[in-house]
A protein has these predicted regions:
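Catalytic-domain carbohydrate-binding cleft regions of carbohydrate-active enzymes
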Residues: 1-193, 198-200, 206, 225, ...
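Surface-exposed beta-strand/loop patches in extracellular or lumenal glycoproteins
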Residues: 207-224
Length: 255
């Protein structure tokens, strides 16, 4: 019944199929063929009574992927289609797990803080979502849902960081996440370029073991230099990398 992007008018489909089922069954005495709306139970029952399979189910031993439904017709394009959306789903999944971890250490954390992001990431596991085989307007909607869910989780993340990190300020700090790193943009870090104000940023490792890696932080071009220190005041190795973009440099550092 229907096919991709075609099964939209259910009533029309059922009206037409009802007529076909009725006609097939009216001449079943001559043709030996009957028709009905079946279920998975009907299918399994029919397969079990099929003489060709009662002796044993066929065993597939070669590769399943890439799938092909005809000569030289491999279903492999979706491995790389819509890479930006694939990356967005992956980074949002990482964000979700990190927020879950931090909320576990936060008293009275809202139970629904991550629900919108969880629901959005659940929807994009559909085989026509993360694969990138959806219509463009649907891809936009998936990204919008993830963005809304991530923004909701960011509020809980900021509250969790304020609880876990010591602060001398009487007012809570509003922590902002660099959510546009894929296009080398981080508004919080670039906004303080050219000022003497220090920039504090939190780096969270959600893994079960310590890791050392290089982090890239976009900064503005107006400042001559930066010094990166850890919470104890120890300087971290860092270098300024020029960017072709008009307002951005990269500040990679080891942490």
């Amino acid at each position: 019944m229907g096919s991709d992007y075609q099964y939209e008018a259910a009533e029309e489909w059922f009206v037409n199929l009802d007529k076909l089922v009725k006609h097939v069954n009216e001449v079943s005495a001559k043709t030996g063929v009957t028709a009905k709306y079946s279920t998975m139970a009907d299918y399994v029952k029919a397969k079990r009574t099929d003489a060709s399979v009662t002796a044993g189910w066929p065993l597939k031993t070669d590769d399943m992927f890439p799938y092909a439904d005809g000569p030289h017709m491999f279903w492999s394009g979706y491995f790389t289609s819509r890479p930006a959306l694939k990356r967005y789903i992956r980074t949002a999944s990482s964000q979700l797990q990190s927020v879950r971890h931090l909320l576990a250490f936060t008293p009275s954390s809202p139970l629904d803080a991550t629900t919108p992001l969880e629901e959005a990431l659940g929807v994009v596991q559909h085989h026509d979502a993360v694969t990138g085989t959806e219509m463009q307007h649907v891809a936009f909607d998936y990204a919008y849902r993830i963005h809304k869910g991530a923004a909701h989780a960011d509020d809980a993340l900021s509250a969790a960081l304020n609880h876990l990190l010591p602060s001398k300020s009487p007012t809570p700090t509003t922590w902002s996440r660099c959510e546009l790193l894929n296009v080398s943009v981080c508004y919080p870090s670039q906004a303080k370029t050219g000022t003497s104000l220090p920039l504090e940023f939190a780096v969270y490792n959600p893994l079960a073991q310590p890791v050392t890696t290089y982090l890239h932080l976009p900064v503005g071009k107006a400042a001559a230099s930066y010094t990166v220190v850890d919470p104890s005041g120890k300087k971290l190795p860092q270098v300024m990398v020029p960017s072709e973009q008009q307002v951005t440099n990269y500040l990679p550092f080891n942490a």
